[in-house]
């Protein structure tokens, strides 16, 4: 007999926080003045009636072309390249106390590759965006990029209309990581969530929850796998231990209920009840050579009334009676291969007397 104490399965949470608080607020790009300058200095400095200023390259006296800096009367600044009097090419835009953008512009708008860094009055709250580095389209976050969230983690992947969409990876500060599909800024679609402790949630997610799939997590000395259906963790479990022992059963809380099936690396198997992770109640243990015991168990050993069959065939060659601590005890009936019956007396696992039993 091979003694084995099975660990209790651990509970696992399949809901998790992913969204930042509120939405992403992108500062609108302010247009530059197009009115005539009220003053010029050496053809490189322009002052406008709305209080804004430009310093840099110009053509035909007032057309901004080349490299230059522009400041609004409200404090915003732009420094970079200009084409035909609008920001185009590489540049830097600063909103005092709010944020900074460094990257590409086209026709006066953020367009192409660029990075935006938010600025907060004090420390940002958990989940607020800190920075975005990626593609921009028509002054909005484009199709892909990397966004960092305060005290939460980093997202890299697809975007649509400024929110996470399509395939992307979110890595939490605590080491958890999700790779898969997103929809409307939520985890939705096929994906894999790997927790820092090695647990794995894989399947179809909906609104940040695993809706259908599998959950794999560690138990003492092994790995457990359970299904998730309609967002609920199912009670059926398969546990594979490091020594290649496999347990298949049903959990209620952290305990097995009903019969379990245990397959050992040696080729032996057990089908029956467990209590506190050990064989207890009624069960059948089958050895690789076909011998098997059917009966009562206690403390992981044959104990109580049972039958020990010396071979696969249950019609002959078996011992019937009382067992204790894995051994036959007292008087048991032995049925031979010729279907003859004998009274046998056992002590300390040894047969001390045999008498023919008349029918």
Show where each model-derived region lies.
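N-terminal Sec-pathway targeting helices
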Residues: 3-13
């Amino acid at each position: 007999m091979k003694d084995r104490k099975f660990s209790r399965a651990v509970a696992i949470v399949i809901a998790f926080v992913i969204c930042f608080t509120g939405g992403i607020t992108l500062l609108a790009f302010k247009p530059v003045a197009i009115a005539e300058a009220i003053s010029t200095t050496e053809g490189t400095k322009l002052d406008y009636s709305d209080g804004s200023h430009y310093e840099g390259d110009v053509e035909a006296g007032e057309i901004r072309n080349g490299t230059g800096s522009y400041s609004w009367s409200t404090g915003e600044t732009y420094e970079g390249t200009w084409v035909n009097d609008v920001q185009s090419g590489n540049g830097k835009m600063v909103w005092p106390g709010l944020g900074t953008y460094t990257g590409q512009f086209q026709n006066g708008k953020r367009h192409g590759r660029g990075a935006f860094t938010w600025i907060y009055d004090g420390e940002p709250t958990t989940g607020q965006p800190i920075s975005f580095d990626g593609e921009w389209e028509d002054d909005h976050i484009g199709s892909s990029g990397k966004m960092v969230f305060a005290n939460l983690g980093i997202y890299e992947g697809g975007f649509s209309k400024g929110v996470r969409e399509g395939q992307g990876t979110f890595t939490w500060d605590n080491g958890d990581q999700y790779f898969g599909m997103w929809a409307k800024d939520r985890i939705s679609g096929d994906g894999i969530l790997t927790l820092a402790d090695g647990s794995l949630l894989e399947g179809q997610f909906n609104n940040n929850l695993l809706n259908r799939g599998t959950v794999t997590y560690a138990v003492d000395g092994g790995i457990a796998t359970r299904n998730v259906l309609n967002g609920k963790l199912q009670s059926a479990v398969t546990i594979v231990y490091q020594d290649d022992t496999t347990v298949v059963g049903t959990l209620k809380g952290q305990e097995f209920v009903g019969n379990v099936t245990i397959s050992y690396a040696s080729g032996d198997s057990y089908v029956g009840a467990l209590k506190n992770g050990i064989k207890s109640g009624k069960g059948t243990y089958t050895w690789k050579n076909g011998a098997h015991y059917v009966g009562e168990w206690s403390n992981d050993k044959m104990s109580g009334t049972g039958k020990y069959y010396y071979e696969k065939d249950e019609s002959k060659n078996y011992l019937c009676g009382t067992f204790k601590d894995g051994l036959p005890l007292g008087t048991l009936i032995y049925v031979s291969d010729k279907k003859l019956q004998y009274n046998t007396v056992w002590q300390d696992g040894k047969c001390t007397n045999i008498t023919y039993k008349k029918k």
